[in-house]
């Protein structure tokens, strides 16, 4: 049975809040703690983007996505493609928080034989829709899925969500997918663009300026909505809720989501050096203390 999960509490035996926004914030804190712990244990990974995307993923899995907890391949589920696969620690921790994988499995991030690799691999983990790797591929995959779903024999209202980083907008493949989706008016496609303005070696606007992103997407036939604070659950839930009705407009939707890389850890926030640098034991301890772990 499909559901939008709002009642999964498998990390801390604490009575959950009732308010919808508080619920997302509750899960977000737990997810961040797991990200810090798993990256410190692995000794490698991408903390900044992972921490910045937590609220986006929490809103999707605890409010928006339709999925069947008993069947990851349910043919009525919504689809999520994570094009910026290096941020997968956030996805893995969210899957654990939602009760879809065992939280103990998070300890094995990037280990030989683990299902939780440095980029999501669908052949290992059934809750994934695609395998990621080179940046720029995910939106093309998502657009193909959305196009296929629209042409199924039976009527359906399934949606495809694709998380894309602003850094990978350097890739030409992204813009081919943007034009394709606009041409075919794929109203069942939502692109969530993680605008955190960092890449491995610096700021996005210094490495490859992207210009007026909203205008570029609109010019290709997309609806565009700006999310000024992509770590604010209220703003995210409002934007994602509005996306539910966007199919009446017959255009794909781009949510330009301005997140804080390293969110929740003061010494990591907005610092591009943490794009691909893991935390050592002392740094992890400081980060966890800021997240309320004593």
Predicted features along the sequence, with ranges:
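Thiamine diphosphate
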Residues: 127, 131-247
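Glycine-rich beta-alpha junction loops
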Residues: 55, 86-87, 196-197, 258-262
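Cofactor-binding active-site loop characterized by glycine-rich and histidine/acidic residues
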Residues: 35-38, 50-183
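N-terminal capping segment at the start of a domain
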Residues: 28-44, 194-196
């Amino acid at each position: 049975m499909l559901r939008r999960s709002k009642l999964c509490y498998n990390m801390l035996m604490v009575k959950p809040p009732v308010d919808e926004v508080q619920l997302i914030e509750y899960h977000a804190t737990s997810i961040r703690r797991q990200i810090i712990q798993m990256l410190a244990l692995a000794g490698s990974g991408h903390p900044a983007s992972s921490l910045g995307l937590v609220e986006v993923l929490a809103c999707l899995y605890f409010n928006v996505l339709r999925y069947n907890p008993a069947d990851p391949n349910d043919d009525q589920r919504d689809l999520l493609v994570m094009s910026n696969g290096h941020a997968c620690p956030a996805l893995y921790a969210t899957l654990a928080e939602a009760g879809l994988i065992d939280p103990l499995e998070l300890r094995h991030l990037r280990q030989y034989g683990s299902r939780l690799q440095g980029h999501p691999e669908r052949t290992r983990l059934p809750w994934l829709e695609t395998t990621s790797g080179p940046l720029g591929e995910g939106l093309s995959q998502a657009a193909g899925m959305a196009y296929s779903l629209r042409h199924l024999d039976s009527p359906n209202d399934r949606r495809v969500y694709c998380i894309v980083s602003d850094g990978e907008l350097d890739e030409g493949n992204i813009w081919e997918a943007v034009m394709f989706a606009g041409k075919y008016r794929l109203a069942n496609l939502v692109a969530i663009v993680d605008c955190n303005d960092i890449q491995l070696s610096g700021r996005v606007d210094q490495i490859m300026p992207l210009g007026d992103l909203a205008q570029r997407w609109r010019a290709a036939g997309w609806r565009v909505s700006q999310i000024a604070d992509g770590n604010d659950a209220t703003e995210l839930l409002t934007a994602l809720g509005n996306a539910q009705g966007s199919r009446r407009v017959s255009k794909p939707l781009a949510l330009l989501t301005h997140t804080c890389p390293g969110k929740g850890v003061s010494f990591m926030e907005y610092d591009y050096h943490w794009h691909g640098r893991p935390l050592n034991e002392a740094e992890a301890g400081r980060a966890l203390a800021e997240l309320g772990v004593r």
